[in-house]
From Swiss-Prot:
It is found in: Cytoplasm. The keyword Aminoacyl-tRNA synthetase does not apply. This is tRNA-cytidine(32) 2-sulfurtransferase. InterPro entries: Rossmann-like_a/b/a_fold, TilS/TtcA_N, tRNA_Cyd_32_2_STrfase, tRNA_thiolation_TtcA_Ctu1. Pathway: tRNA modification. It comes from Chelativorans sp. (strain BNC1). It catalyses: cytidine(32) in tRNA + S-sulfanyl-L-cysteinyl-[cysteine desulfurase] + AH2 + ATP = 2-thiocytidine(32) in tRNA + L-cysteinyl-[cysteine desulfurase] + A + AMP + diphosphate + H(+).
C-alpha cells in the first residue's frame, strides 16, 4: 500500500537485529520481508495519525490472540531499534472465562522480560447473566473490557491504550455501520475516550490480517483461543468478513483501495448537510 509521505525504506534497520523475542524467529527471506512490512506499516500509521509523543507511557492490551501478540512484538521491535520513544506496559484482562489458561501470558511476558500487569475481573458472569444464551456475548464483553482497560491505564499513568485492530477490522466495522447502522463510520486509528483522558491507538490499521496470521505462525506465539466462553462473534461481522474476502478474491487489491478511500472523503459528494453547506451552494 502507498500512502502520503511514506516511511522511507532506507530508514528500516537490518532485520537481523531486534528484540530478543525474535531470537528463534524464522530466518527466511519471506519472513524477513513480512516482518519489515509490518514494521513499515506500523511506522506509517504512527506518522499519518500522529500517534507517538516521546516520553509517553502506553498500555498495550494483550488478549492472547494473534493480533495482540503481533502488535506487542512489532512495538517491542521498534522500541528495541530506538524507533519508538515511549514506555510500554503489556496488560491482560482475565475476564473469568471458563478454562482460561491463566499461566500462558504471565509466563510468556516474564520470560521475555516485558513489563506487564495481569488483571482479573469476572465480566464473564456479568455477560452471561445479562445476555440470553443463544445470543453473542462479544459486544457487551468488549464494552466491559474497554472500561476496565481505561481504568487500568489511569492507574498506571498511561496516556494511551493500544489495541490490536487491523485493516480488516476497520473495513468490517465500516460496512457493518453502512449496511446495518445507516451511517458512514469505521474504526479510527486514533480516538480520544469520552472522558477525554485516554487516547485509543490502533497501530495495525494498515496491516493485513493474512500477514498477522503468517507472522503469528512464524513466531509460534502461544495463542489463546477467543471462543473459550462458547460464544461466537456476531453474524453481521462474519457476513462482512465473508463479503470482503469474496471481493478480494475476485478483485485482488480492493481492500487496499477501500482503506485509501477512508482517507479520501469528499463531503460535497455525499448527503450529509452537517458536513457540507448545500443551502449556501448556488450560482452567483
Amino acid at each position: 500500500m502507498t500512502f502520503h509521505q511514506p516511511v522511507s525504506e532506507t530508514a528500516q534497520p537490518d532485520e537481523a537485529s531486534g528484540h530478543p523475542l525474535f531470537a528463534d524467529a524464522p530466518s527466511s527471506v519471506e519472513f524477513n520481508k513480512l516482518r519489515k512490512r509490518l514494521l513499515r506499516q506500523v511506522r506509517q500509521a504512527f506518522e499519518d495519525f500522529t500517534m507517538v509523543k516521546p516520553g509517553d507511557r502506553w498500555l498495550v492490551a494483550l488478549s492472547g490472540g494473534k493480533d495482540s501478540y503481533g502488535l506487542l512484538a512489532v512495538l517491542l521491535d521498534l522500541k528495541w531499534r530506538g524507533l519508538l520513544p515511549v514506555e510500554l506496559l503489556a496488560c491482560n484482562l482475565d475476564q473469568g472465562q471458563p478454562n482460561f489458561p491463566k499461566h500462558i501470558l504471565p509466563d510468556y511476558l516474564t520470560r521475555l522480560g516485558v513489563p506487564h500487569r495481569i488483571e482479573y475481573q469476572d465480566t464473564y458472569s456479568v455477560v452471561t447473566e445479562k445476555i440470553p444464551e443463544n445470543r453473542t456475548y462479544c459486544s457487551l464483553c468488549s464494552r466491559l473490557r474497554r472500561g476496565h482497560l481505561y481504568r487500568i491505564a489511569r492507574e498506571e499513568g498511561c496516556s494511551s491504550l493500544v489495541l490490536g485492530h487491523h485493516r480488516e477490522d476497520i473495513l468490517e466495522t465500516f460496512f457493518m455501520n453502512f449496511f446495518h447502522g445507516g451511517r458512514l463510520a469505521a474504526m479510527p486509528p486514533k480516538l480520544l475516550n469520552d472522558e477525554g483522558d485516554v487516547l485509543v491507538l490502533r497501530p495495525l490499521a494498515y496491516c493485513a490480517e493474512t500477514d498477522l496470521v503468517k507472522f503469528a505462525e512464524g513466531m509460534k506465539f502461544p495463542i489463546i483461543p477467543c471462543d473459550l466462553c462458547g460464544s461466537q462473534d456476531g453474524l453481521q461481522r462474519n457476513a462482512m468478513k465473508a463479503m470482503l474476502e469474496d471481493i478480494e478474491r475476485r478483485m485482488p487489491g480492493r481492500k487496499d483501495t477501500m482503506i485509501r478511500a477512508l482517507a479520501n472523503v469528499r463531503p460535497s459528494h455525499l448527503l450529509d448537510r452537517q458536513l457540507f453547506d448545500f443551502a449556501g451552494l448556488g450560482i452567483l
